[in-house]
Amino acid sequence: MTGAISSVKSEDLVKLYMSDEIKDKNELEGQNPDDLGNSDAQEQHSDYKPVNRFDASAVHHLSGMYQNWFLDYASYVILERAVPHIEDGLKPVQRRILHSMKRMDDGRYNKVANIVGHTMQFHPHGDASIGDALVQMGQKDLLIDTQGNWGNILTGDRAAAPRYIEARLSKFALDVVFNPKTTDWQLSYDGRNKEPITLPAKFPLLLAQGAEGIAVGLSSKVLPHNFNDLCDAAIHYLRGEDFAIYPDFPTGGAIDVSKYNDGQRGGALKVRAKIDKLDSKTLVITEIPYSKTTVSLIESITKAVE
């Protein structure tokens, strides 16, 4: 947006907003009311004042206005939609889903369509975004106990429709994620309800689940880690001992962490699928790289053969 503004000539901006001429206000006092319906008279009586030279202050004000708008929009997308909070490791839609499920919790499964409807009280971005986020959380098998066809992360098959599948909070989530006494609250988007600013999670969910989001001007990508490895790392940290921890993926695969750089910017990982040759015509794929599916892997093998 800034580049687009800078490409417009200053003279054109001045002409665009200040091209009309106006008479002195003293001359308007004696104007005949019948002339107000005349289009020529209306053009002469414009509220704009003539500008005979470049007005730098006006152009500066315009660019500043666009800069503020951009920052407001970028901040909204970063904080309210795309990037997880480091304290609980959750994006706003994930936090609102868990909060809604906690309010609904009675120990029994709820239809996903029902959960989505309740979450819309807190998340004003439509049912599709809520449903997709809920399925992704359910497939990670940590915070949500699922029932029904929730898709397959290995094959890429999608989950069944929300009216056919059910979910409830896992025992782990009930024990670790919620504590109303230590939760800071804020009003929901319409002011009718209260929602948590962050959840007082007692486990590093950001590292356990991983997160990926694309915002305005930045992106985040945190890879998932093994549950037991995180527990061991926490113990070493509390004891003041050195430790090393690396990502681990639910889809398996062989990993090269030589360029991981402790997960900092510029680090990289290599993950390879595990393929066994059964016979001259059959390959058995038992592990695949994270975020890939068997369908995409088979397609890449086919292209390599061709």
Predicted stretch roles:
Residues A268-E306:
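Gly/Lys-enriched N-terminal cap/neck module of very large, oligomeric protein machines
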Residues T2-A4, A41:
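Ala/Thr-enriched low-complexity intrinsically disordered regions
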Residues S6-L13:
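Intrinsically disordered, low-complexity segments enriched in serine/proline and basic residues
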Residues L13-G266:
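Catalytic phosphate-handling regions of large nucleic-acid enzymes and associated NTPases
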